[in-house]
Amino acid sequence: MTYVAAENRYEKMIYNRCGRSGLKLPAISLGLWHNFGDDTPHRTKQAIVRKAFDLGITHFDLANNYGPPPGSAETPFGEILRTDFSAYRDELIISTKAGYEMWAGPYGEWGGRKYMLASLDQSLKRMGLDYVDIFYSHRFDPDTPLEETMGALDHAVRSGKALYAGISSYNSQRTREAADILRQLGTPCVIHQPSYSMLNRWVEEDGLLDTLEGLGVGSIVFSPLAQGMLTDKYLGGIPDGSRASQGKSLKTAFINDRTIANIKALNAIAGKRGQTLAQMALAWVLRRGRVTSALIGASRPEQVEDCVGALKVLDFSDAELAEIDTYARESDINLWAASAERKGPPRK
């Protein structure tokens, strides 16, 4: 059956300007980091993307290595674009990234020009696109001059293969350096994608949000639900089949007694607000208008709908924020900390 987008898709979504650019993003965007690889049925992927767009989510975030296995998220997304969304391409913001390992040898990861541009070409081929709207440096490269990495982003934009340049997981200092280089090249840094949640507050401690505001750069935060920890999934411990039980990016050590107690307390606060824990967690990262968009992941269309429901109650009282701060504690779950520093892992 031919897909026809909901006529009212723009009525309830909020769209925020990305820094000082002309780009607007939905307050909730869909990320395809997990749940879009070969281990997920195509019909499920298709249903998730359709539901997202019907709810006004116009931004779909990918990377070269998303899967599993790496690269396998972009291919089915491209197929969905061809079968369902060819008539809506001009209504979509599609992003991809390069930085993590994709192929063997010395040119298969990090931030060198050869890798970055080859990776972009591969992503475009997998998705069947002529261009992406945003192309990111996925992580800071401690061994490649930042001028080279930013030069690759600049080239991608000037060649018409990307409309905007962005960076991900860079700390404040590296962000300022990257933005300065891009500004001199004439291709501004439009967006930064850091991790941020109630349990991962490094962007506050680092001053990154202040830096972005000063630079006029937008922000789209990933893992605002702490890989599912800020949902009802782990309130009773680690369930079978969950990401933590599989020992993947969410490690079982993260789900300790202290963290579960804090999550339960946050869930109670959400209940008093008439929200699910996930909805409150999303509203919290969007508070005060400092974050342009929150990236969600979903394994079912219903999860997308629940997350978009967060936009119904975005305001917090001072008392609520103070109570949340009692339990929204840094939980050492920032897996991407090394991506922001020169002290990154050594090359193989």
Regions found by a protein language model. Give the residues of each.
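N-terminal binding-site loop/beta-alpha segment at the start of enzyme catalytic domains
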Residues: 1-92, 158
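Active-site groove signature of glycoside hydrolases
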Residues: 124-144
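Short, acidic/polar
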Residues: 39-53, 111-127, 175-179
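Beta/alpha (TIM)-barrel catalytic core signal, keyed to glycine-rich beta->alpha loops juxtaposed to Asp/Glu
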Residues: 3-7, 12, 141-328, 343-348
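Short acidic capping loops at alpha-helix termini that bridge into adjacent secondary structure
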Residues: 26-27, 61, 87-92, 130-134, ...
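Conserved beta-strand positions
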Residues: 30, 62, 96, 134-137, ...
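Alpha-helix N-cap and loop-to-helix initiation/capping positions
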Residues: 40-44, 72, 76, 107-115, ...
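N-terminal small/glycine-rich loop or linker at the start of catalytic domains
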Residues: 19-37, 95-108, 131, 136
